[in-house]
């Protein structure tokens, strides 16, 4: 940047305060009248030049005022810099560039000890390493911001819909290893190619009820498969299938063995897992009460059989390891502490074993108020 008189101590062009813009629209004017000036990363700097400071020895107060906007690395007075009479010029270097931006915005044209401050950037005081670091930080910031914008743009893209039901079924079977991959052609030319024929697509049973671990045999139950598929197309059979789906999985397994052509079919999944089953409020309360009673009976059974030699369900908790302290007195003290801890833990009061009805009746009922 060229200077006005060509000397290093002269006033640079970017140090001169620009006049207020008078052609700005009314709706764009802020609270304070400002000039039109564009700052690039090359013009911004951690160094701030403060002009118009009254020469009353208020450097400490000035630094404290600027320290409100960020950490200051160094500061000094510029005696050789040309200034007005009875004023001084100071140079302050901030640790972060963002702190210098905020300080310049807040402290420019502010009153300080009767004088009007003029704050501007001073990039000519930067070293080559500081300028390189500033440019690298700016590049990293730009790449991070553009990457986030690209991420949000790609996130808002609509997902393409599936064209056909057959394609979706093929994708479903391809991603689910537990299902047999059915053949599209029900009458293959080479039976050796399709070594594991399972349910054809013409069968209208829900696919979520069938799962297999081992491949199905090729020549088994071919006649039964066609009969079951033809019978499953009728709505009456589907309605009967829905009615039987409420039974336990063991009964479902017996009914599917006669209709499914695969020899190795696991137990069918209950319909209540796939479709939500309506249950009245009273039934839900009764079911909860029954489960609480079962849990209570199981707990009392385990408590009564602790002394016996029966195997308990669940892993055994590890005991407190005994540590040898290599001293008789210390070992005696440690044993006393362990025994005391066992007494404290065993003396915890147990909850009452009575039924919930007895507990409810133990509390006195509130008398009904008569009007």
UniProtKB/Swiss-Prot annotation:
Residues 46-124 form the RRM domain. One of its GO terms (biological process) is mRNA processing. GO terms for molecular function: RNA binding. GO terms for cellular component: nucleoplasm; spliceosomal complex. InterPro entries: RBD_domain_sf (IPR035979), RBM48 (IPR039599), RBM48_RRM (IPR034264). Coiled coil: none annotated. CDD domains: RRM_RBM48. Residues 220-249, 343-371 are annotated as: Disordered. Transmembrane segments: none annotated. Keywords: mRNA processing, mRNA splicing, RNA-binding, Spliceosome. As a component of the minor spliceosome, involved in the splicing of U12-type introns in pre-mRNAs. Component of the minor spliceosome. Within this complex, interacts with ARMC7 and PRPF8/PRP8. PANTHER family: RNA-BINDING PROTEIN 48. Belongs to the RBM48 family. This is RNA-binding protein 48. It comes from Rattus norvegicus.
């Amino acid at each position: 940047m060229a200077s006005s008189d060509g000397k290093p101590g002269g006033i640079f062009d970017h140090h001169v305060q620009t006049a207020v813009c008078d052609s700005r629209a009314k709706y764009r004017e802020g609270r304070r009248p400002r000039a039109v000036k564009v700052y690039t990363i090359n013009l911004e700097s951690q160094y701030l030049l403060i002009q118009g400071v009254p020469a009353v020895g208020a450097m400490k107060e000035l630094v404290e005022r600027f320290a409100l906007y960020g950490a200051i690395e160094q500061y000094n007075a510029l005696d050789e810099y040309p200034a007005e009479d009875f004023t001084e010029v100071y140079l302050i270097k901030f640790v972060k560039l963002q702190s210098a931006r905020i300080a310049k915005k807040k402290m420019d044209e502010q009153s300080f000890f009767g004088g009007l401050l003029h704050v501007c950037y001073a990039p000519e005081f930067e070293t080559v390493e500081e300028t390189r670091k500033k440019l690298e930080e700016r590049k990293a910031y730009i790449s991070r911001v553009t990457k986030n914008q690209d991420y949000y743009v790609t996130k808002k893209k609509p997902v393409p819909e599936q064209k056909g039901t057959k394609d979706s079924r093929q994708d479903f079977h391809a991603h689910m290893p537990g299902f047999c991959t059915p053949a599209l052609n029900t009458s293959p030319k080479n039976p050796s190619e399709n070594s594991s024929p399972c349910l054809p697509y013409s069968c209208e049973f829900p696919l979520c009820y069938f799962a297999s671990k081992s491949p199905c045999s090729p020549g088994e139950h071919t006649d039964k498969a066609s009969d079951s598929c033809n019978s499953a197309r009728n709505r009456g059979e589907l309605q009967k299938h829905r009615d039987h789906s409420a039974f336990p999985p063991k009964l479902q397994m017996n009914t599917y063995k006669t209709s499914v052509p695969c020899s190795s079919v696991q137990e069918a999944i209950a319909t209540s897992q796939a479709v939500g089953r309506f249950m009245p409020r009273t039934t839900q309360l009764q079911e909860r009460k029954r489960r609480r009673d079962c849990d209570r009976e199981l707990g009392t059974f385990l408590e009564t059989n602790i002394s016996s030699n029966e195997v308990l369900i669940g892993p055994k908790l590890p005991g407190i390891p005994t540590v040898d302290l290599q001293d008789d007195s210390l070992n005696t003290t440690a044993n006393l502490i362990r025994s005391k801890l066992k007494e404290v833990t065993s003396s915890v009061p147990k909850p009452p074993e009575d039924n919930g009805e007895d507990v409810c009746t133990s509390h006195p009922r509130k008398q009904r108020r008569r009007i």
